[in-house]
Amino acid sequence: PQLILSLCWGFAVLIPWAAIEGNIKSVVLLFCWLATVFWTFGFDTVYALADKKFDLEIGVNSSAVHLASNTKFTVQICYLLTSVFLAFCALINQLNWIFWPIWLITAFLMQKDTLKIFPESKQSIREIGNHFKKQSIYGGFILLGFVISS
């Protein structure tokens, strides 16, 4: 389910771009789409941890179930790739220096927050919810960085 959601949310990048530009032929668009897909997969995998017990009971092969002991590593890689693809977008668009501290702090916090929900003994509904909420805040900071640095 998390992969499908990630691909669908990726259309939130593709559709407006196509409507404004009239095409989807852009390396920046590709990087934005990839950042969206990886970020969504990462944070929705964390969100799926809250339901992992129920997914196992009813046979749902969520990413939290499928990845098992590789979940932490996968989420960290997803967040790393998200940060890298966003950096490529910023470089290509020659954003000014204001973006980079925002990007660096956000990339660091995304990784740091992952440690708060692993190992599995730390996975309370509250911690998972906080992680999910913080991801939306980080997204807001990244957006702000793009806007004020353009």
Which residues does each PLM region occupy?
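Multi-pass alpha-helical membrane architecture of UbiA-family
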Residues: 1-150
